[in-house]
């Protein structure tokens, strides 16, 4: 499976970006019908995204749509449009509880049945944006087999906490809570956006923090951030060589019917082998010096 490190937000009302965003090289494009779209443009943006999702050039890249919350006048209409158009994943903003996911899942399944899509083919992502969402992160992450990822969204979260964006200290607990919930549920976790697009040094510092904590990637707001993020997540040649040795040792042990895998006198267990396979998968997109 192709790694999903970068998810690039594309404003749903920006027809020019909708028609070209597949060329930027992000692992996934995330059409935004929520915060990036004004109230008067909601209907137009929904139609533009509906049309973009059906374009042949988007068939080779993962598509995600951030809909409006279901308790707004726009959320259900967004969902009807994007599921019928064949979106790969729906991102639900402001997810506070497992019930939010259950409601979303019920609507998605109904729409799939009505339009003839394979039931279960539309994946879900929960965006956690409040103290309540952080507290309920584990139950949210386990709420549905459709849920492929959870993401932390910083702006609403820090507002809810009565603080503001700073050096990252204000997000540390939430990051750890979301990560632990994702790992317990066996799904991916995505870090917050870095909105200061001209501060490359700051972006790289936060991207390295996200990687070192264990996030699978980040949501992005500018195409210039894609290659920077991919370089952060790219393994080194030494890491790739070691991973290949681990995989070879595991395959040899399996061929010989051995129950124990060892490499250079050290025992190798399942998690190490799984990690090696992930390193090799990442290396297909580039290797750092």
UniProtKB/Swiss-Prot annotation:
- Whether Lipid biosynthesis counts among this entry's keywords is no
Q: Relay the cofactor remark from the entry.
A: Binds 1 Mg(2+) ion per subunit.
Question: Which reaction(s) are listed as its catalytic activity?
Answer: citrate = oxaloacetate + acetate; (3S)-citryl-CoA = oxaloacetate + acetyl-CoA
Entry keyword set? Cytoplasm, Lyase, Magnesium, Metal-binding
Q: Where in the cell is it found?
A: Cytoplasm
Question: What InterPro entries does its record include?
Answer: Aldolase/citrate-lyase_domain, Citrate_lyase_beta/mcl1/mcl2, Citrate_lyase_beta_bac, Pyrv/PenolPyrv_kinase-like_dom, Pyrv_kinase-like_dom_sf
User: What does the subunit comment say?
Assistant: Oligomer with a subunit composition of (alpha,beta,gamma)6.
Q: Return the similarity comment.
A: Belongs to the HpcH/HpaI aldolase family. Citrate lyase beta subunit subfamily.
Q: What is this protein called?
A: Citrate lyase subunit beta
């Amino acid at each position: 499976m192709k790694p999903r490190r970068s998810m690039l937000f594309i404003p749903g009302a920006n027809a020019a970006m909708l028609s070209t965003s597949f060329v930027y090289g992000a692992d996934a494009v995330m059409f935004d019908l929520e915060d990036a779209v004004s109230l008067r443009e909601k209907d137009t943006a929904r139609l533009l995204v509906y049309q973009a999702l059906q374009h042949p050039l988007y068939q080779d890249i993962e598509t995600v749509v951030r809909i409006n919350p279901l308790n707004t006048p726009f959320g259900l209409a967004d969902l009807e449009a994007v599921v019928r158009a064949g979106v790969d994943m729906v991102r639900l903003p402001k997810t506070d509880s497992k019930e939010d996911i259950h409601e979303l899942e019920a609507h998605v399944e109904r729409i799939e049945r009505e339009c003839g899509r394979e039931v279960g083919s539309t994946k879900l992502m929960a965006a956690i944006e409040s103290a309540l969402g952080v507290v309920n992160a584990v139950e949210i992450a386990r709420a549905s087999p459709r849920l492929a990822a959870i993401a932390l969204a910083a702006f609403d979260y820090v507002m809810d906490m009565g603080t503001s964006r700073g050096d990252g200290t204000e997000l540390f607990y939430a990051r750890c809570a979301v990560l632990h919930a994702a790992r317990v549920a066996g799904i991916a976790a995505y870090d917050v956006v870095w909105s200061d697009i001209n501060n490359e040094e700051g972006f790289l510092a936060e991207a390295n923090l996200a990687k070192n904590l264990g996030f699978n990637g980040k949501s992005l707001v500018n195409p210039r951030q894609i290659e920077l993020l991919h370089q952060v997540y790219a393994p080194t040649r030494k890491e790739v060589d070691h991973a290949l040795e681990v995989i070879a040792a595991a395959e040899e042990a399996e061929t010989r019917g051995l129950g124990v895998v060892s490499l250079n006198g050290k025992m190798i267990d399942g998690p190490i082998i799984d990690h090696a396979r992930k390193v090799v998968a990442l290396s297909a997109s580039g290797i750092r010096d």
